[in-house]
Design a protein with these regions (language model features):
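Accessory beta-strand-rich segments of carbohydrate-active enzymes
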Residues: 3-5, 9-15, 67-183
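Beta-strand elements of well-folded, non-transmembrane domains
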Residues: 9, 81-85, 97, 142-144, ...
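Surface-exposed, low-complexity/disordered Ser/Thr/Gly/Pro/Asn-rich loops and linkers
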Residues: 55, 60-63, 67
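Beta-strand-rich binding/interaction modules
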Residues: 91, 103-105, 200-248
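Exposed aromatic-hydrophobic patches
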Residues: 121-127, 242-251, 256-258
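Short glycine/proline/serine/threonine-rich loop/turn segments at secondary-structure transition edges
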Residues: 132, 146-147, 218-220, 251-258
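Surface beta-strand/loop "capping" patches
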Residues: 180-214
Length: 258
């Protein structure tokens, strides 16, 4: 199951400003925020037309393009969401392309399944939430509490001269389910084997590293993970059958995830 959370959300800023915004999207795009004027100028020595070199906080900024709306701080982005019956599965919310982000459900902080970054999605786990209507609230903060703000804001990912320090969620925003146990990551490392160590694979081995998702409750025994590719199916690689046998691995060595 996957449900997109696109649509209208209610927004409240720290100064009490309220509005409606569409997700995916930013406060700027939805006309929420303040005028982009001299008070937001990062370079006090820049030409602003100010007498005696003093900064006029209401003066236009002459050194870059300005935004119609700007805002730095926490934005509460809320909406009523109906959680369907998800049986024995686990329930997650994914928010992609966001700044510092937290999720509340009915006022309670949700557990972070995977911490996001400016370029990777946040994933929150809601397993245990009862089916029915709940209030979801994203706390989106582009002042980066607990993060290296200066390093972020002076990089091309957030300066007003480049991508701007927007606030919102620009990528996918969805709610989805997964089985109680699922593979969280799978890494394959091809390597050559020394001549004296060559085996029936003809000198090449694929090392496979499998990690179960955190919170797995039961461990499957005698599980086989088989990697397939067009090259294998088409017989373009030598020793295709042997390779297929090697890259099938037993799950006996899997241990419970934390």
């Amino acid at each position: 199951m996957r449900i997109l959370l696109n649509g209208k959300w209610h927004v409240v800023l720290e100064d009490g400003t309220t509005g409606q915004m569409d997700l995916p999207g930013t406060l700027d795009e939805n006309g929420i925020g303040h005028r982009d004027v001299g008070a937001n100028q990062w370079h006090p020595d820049a030409v602003l037309g100010n007498a005696a070199g003093e900064i006029d906080k209401d003066a236009p900024i002459a050194t870059r393009f300005t935004r119609r709306h700007t805002y730095e701080g926490e934005a509460r982005i809320s909406r009523k969401i109906t959680v369907p019956d998800y049986g024995t599965d686990r329930l997650f919310v994914l928010a992609e392309r966001a700044r510092a982000l937290r999720l509340l459900v009915d006022g309670e902080v949700c557990r972070v399944f995977r911490q996001g970054t400016l370029s990777t999605p946040y994933i929150f786990e809601l397993t245990g939430a009862a089916p029915g209507e709940h209030e979801f609230t994203f706390l989106s903060d582009n002042s980066y509490p607990g993060m290296p703000k200066a390093a972020i804001c002076y990089s091309s990912a957030a300066t007003d001269e480049t991508q701007t320090n927007w606030n919102g969620i620009l990528g996918e925003c969805s709610m989805y389910t997964r089985p109680q146990n699922f593979i969280d990551s799978l890494r394959v490392y091809p390597r050559a084997v020394k001549k004296e160590e060559k085996n029936k694979a003809g000198g090449y081995v694929l090392d496979v590293c499998v990690e179960l998702a955190p919170g797995a409750k039961e461990i499957y025994k005698d599980t086989k993970i088989v990697l397939q590719s067009e090259a294998l199916a088409a017989g373009e690689l030598e020793n295709t059958q042997t390779l297929t046998e090697i890259i099938s691995c037993s799950g006996e060595g899997l241990t419970e995830a934390g």
